[in-house]
């Protein structure tokens, strides 16, 4: 990923190296709590039902506590019966967002900041992107996480 903007001295053209050609699809999944980013997971490739079920089973489920609420958008891989069963078996509740409502999904604000930080790091390879994500996650303070939830209309 490359920065979207830059600056140069007046009268001089801005030059920067940016990737072009074929790119690889990378997926980052995480949970947002009122005080931290939880259950981060990075995979090479797009998300599908099987990989999302693996994420829920191996990464998210161990962090869930009874009474937690899992907010999901309407991506097809989120609606699988196995996923719903796994989340409910941990004592957590499921809440599916209405279609086309990213403003109600607080993790979207996290992803926007995360993308900005990755672009700023100018990570060009899969390993560099993964390392940039690892360095960026501590930048999310407890106050900021609580603000993302409040901004989307959730109270904790």
Write out the residue ranges for each language-model feature.
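Short functional hotspots at interaction and active-site rims
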Residues: 1-156
